[in-house]
A protein has these predicted regions:
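Short glycine/acidic-enriched loop and turn motifs that connect beta-strands
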Residues: 75-79, 131-135, 185-187, 243-244, ...
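Beta-rich, blade/repeat-based domains predominating
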Residues: 110-120, 163-174, 210-232, 266-281, ...
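Short loop/turn segments immediately following beta-strands, especially the blade-tip
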Residues: 94-99, 146-152, 193-200, 250-256, ...
Length: 432
């Protein structure tokens, strides 16, 4: 059942005009919310230094614009109200065009910078802060930064409430005038208008999700975890870990409202976290955090309809011992390979549970074939990104940023020996 209602939230998390749509999402039982990432640390076995020179890759070498990487770091537990954040929450790095090595050029304070998104012009960077006590209230927050086109450095513009607790993900609409945010503990997807100068207005509308799932620890309520535009820019996929659903929304740019178009239910207890579309907009890949699988669906980008399930593949070998947990899913620029991250949460024993996992993509069907669990220099990877040329993969680990060479023929990853040691990295995004 859906109904529109005015919001009765506090001034801290809303604006004077707000549209609210509540969606029933069925199911569930159990006891309490979010599980914080453990501070697990484990020694990586030393391995011989491989030959990882860019010459091993067939990517042509040509003059390129300056390239930069942006990383966000954990500064405190996400739900620890009143904790003092660390000094540095975001770092900017230059990328060496020959070696892919990262050199820090700027560090800024930011409170638990969890995920990033560029506007379409890449002149602005938007950041969600995965917290639950913004300005003494009970919401997360969103920050806006201007990007210097020559130096890559950031200038803070402003910060707004995310309109819900524990902001987890965000996307900018193709026109660059709206920011869509998923609030993990807020049970909602929200919209913030973007001004001409890149700064953010307060939340103007939200979609609230009702429901739960069968996992008694992680699915007692809705947990929106991702918002991702399809390649045509017409529709937004919203993954909700708590209710085992992926919703498709259309953004009405005149009213700034999200309108539901379709939805699909994953396997009970799967916990959909993030999604990825193929370039043609005909396939939708969903990485499921709680059962460590990837599910592939047909997708119609003209109507925003999710079609039949084509494949479900495990990201870990069986038998598996320990807690299963996936995080990120990204398709390589070539369209030939897909990667996901497995996070080795506390108590895991199967080594492949802590890895960047590589697959080939069947160009006819979209189906995945597992080719590698890359475990060298990998420790609880929340996120990863490719450099702008698709030569390197940078993994956001609990102990720093590791650099891996991508074999352009096979998709296999090789650790380069470069590890930028940092506090726990939540996210990395590249530009250039």
């Amino acid at each position: 059942m859906t109904n529109n209602r005015p919001s009765n939230r506090s001034e801290n998390g809303t604006v004077d005009r707000r549209f609210v749509l509540r969606l029933a999402a069925g199911g569930g039982v159990a006891a309490a919310g979010i599980v914080a990432s453990s501070n697990l640390s484990r020694a990586q076995e030393a391995s011989p230094e491989p030959d990882v020179t860019p010459a091993a890759s067939p990517v042509p070498v040509e003059a390129v614009a300056p390239q930069f990487a942006y990383a966000g770091f954990a500064s405190r537990p996400a739900i620890e109200a009143g904790a003092d954040p660390a000094t540095t929450g975001i770092s900017v790095y230059s990328i060496d065009p020959d070696t892919g090595a990262l050199t820090e050029i700027q560090a800024l304070g930011s409170d638990n910078a969890f995920f990033f998104a560029f506007d379409p012009s890449e002149r602005f960077l938007y950041v969600v802060n995965v917290i639950a006590d913004y300005e003494g209230g009970d919401t997360g927050s969103v920050e806006a930064y201007a990007i210097d086109g020559d130096t890559g450095m950031l200038t803070f513009l402003n910060r707004q409430s995310s309109g819900g607790a524990v902001a987890a993900h965000l996307s900018v609409d193709p026109g660059g005038r709206h920011l869509v945010v998923a609030n993990y503990n807020g049970m909602n997807f929200v919209v913030l208008p973007i001004n001409e100068d890149g700064s953010l207005e307060p939340v103007i509308s939200e979609v609230v999700i009702d429901g739960s799932g069968p996992n008694p620890d992680r699915q007692t309520m809705s947990h929106p975890h991702a918002v991702t535009y399809d390649p045509a820019g017409n529709f937004i996929a919203g993954a909700d870990l708590g209710v085992d659903k992926v919703f498709i929304f259309r953004l009405n740019t005149e009213t700034s409202e999200l309108e539901q178009v379709s939805e699909v239910s994953t396997a009970p207890g799967a916990g959909p976290r993030h999604v990825a579309f193929n370039e043609e907009g005909t396939l939708l890949y969903v990485v499921n955090e709680l059962n460590a699988t990837i599910t592939l669906y047909a997708y119609d980008s003209a109507t925003g309809t999710i079609g039949e399930e084509i494949q479900t593949i495990s990201t870990v070998p069986e038998p598996y011992v320990g807690t299963k947990s996936t995080a990120e899913i990204v398709i390589h620029q070539s369209g030939n390979f897909l990667y996901n991250s497995n996070r080795g949460l506390e108590g895991f024993e199967t080594p492949e549970g802590d890895a960047i996992v590589a697959y080939t993509i069947d160009q006819e069907t979209g189906e995945l074939t597992l080719i590698q669990h890359q475990m060298d220099a990998i420790e609880m990877p929340e996120n990863f990104a490719f450099d702008p040329t698709g030569t390197w993969l940078y993994a956001a680990n609990a102990n720093g940023i590791s650099q891996h060479l991508i074999d352009q023929e096979t998709g296999m990853l090789t650790f380069t020996g470069n590890l930028v040691e940092t506090p726990k990295v939540f996210v990395i995004l590249t530009r250039g």
